[in-house]
């Protein structure tokens, strides 16, 4: 995933992977997004929610991984090349 610069704003690419109900709501298993450098996981979730009301409902119940590590604080900044996994609650046993 490459970094690009537009004007004075530095933009970065991040990947988003959707699982289970999030995949169904998003209509895709993954996407790559170009975002402003310095956006947080919470900013990304807000943006995804604003684009798709069905996905917004699912995202309220999800947990997130950033490059395979649990996100405990949505104020965590994103960096070029990060991959965010969107994980709805799973049932199992």
Regions found by a protein language model. Name each.
Residues 1-92:
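Ubiquitin-like/PB1-type beta-grasp interaction modules and other compact soluble beta-rich domains
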């Amino acid at each position: 995933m490459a970094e690009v610069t537009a004007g004075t704003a530095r933009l970065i690419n991040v990947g988003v992977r959707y699982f289970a109900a999030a995949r169904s709501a998003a209509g895709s298993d993954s996407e790559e997004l170009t975002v402003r450098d310095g956006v947080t996981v919470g900013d990304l979730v807000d943006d995804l929610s604003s684009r798709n009301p069905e996905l917004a409902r699912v995202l309220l119940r999800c947990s997130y991984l950033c490059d395979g590590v649990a996100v405990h604080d949505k104020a965590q900044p994103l960096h070029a090349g990060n991959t965010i996994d969107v994980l709805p609650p799973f049932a199992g046993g």
